[in-house]
Amino acid sequence: MISINMTIENAEWGDEKILYTITEKALIATIDRLSLTQVTSELSLLFTNNMRMAQINTQWRNKNKPTNVLSFPAFPLKAGQNPGPMLGDIVLARETIVYEAEEEGKSFHDHLTHMIVHGILHLLGYDHETDDEAYQMEELEKEILQKIAIKNPYTELL
């Protein structure tokens, strides 16, 4: 079992129980798909705003701007490896996720779930630096999200 620790820095995120439920659903679907249900680990999430995300992005990636999600693995993993006792940290920026959801015609909760799945996959060693890696990661995301009744996030709006 992977335990979830959450820090909510911004009241605009709303109800902590709803955020926990979304996170738990994303985590369970991801670990089920990757056959990691027997793993014991810990996941931390920071729900913050664009200003704080820009600070973190500058500090760790030298990019002075907010982004939707950042992942910080506790231990470097290759895709398919079992995680250690601490999976890592995921940071989410509310304003960016709200903006993207509106621009892409998605519900906020569906897009947030996608960003959490995306972050978890990064912590588990998946990446999108090459076309092959991006394809593999996107396919996993689509499969995981489909299991929890969320449409393909990569479908273009017409």
Curated annotation (Swiss-Prot):
Its main location: cytoplasm. Pfam families: YbeY. One of its GO terms (cellular component) is cytoplasm. Its EC number is 3.1.-.-. Zn(2+) binds at H118, H122, H128. One of its GO terms (molecular function) is zinc ion binding. InterPro entries: MetalPrtase_cat_dom_sf_prd, YbeY, YbeY_CS. It is found in: Cytoplasm. GO terms for biological process: rRNA processing. Keywords: Cytoplasm, Endonuclease, Hydrolase, Metal-binding, Nuclease, Ribosome biogenesis, rRNA processing, Zinc. Binds 1 zinc ion. PROSITE patterns: UPF0054 (PS01306). Its cofactor is Zn(2+). Belongs to the endoribonuclease YbeY family. Single strand-specific metallo-endoribonuclease involved in late-stage 70S ribosome quality control and in maturation of the 3' terminus of the 16S rRNA. NCBIfam families: rRNA maturation RNase YbeY. This is Endoribonuclease YbeY. It comes from Bartonella bacilliformis (strain ATCC 35685 / KC583 / Herrer 020/F12,63).
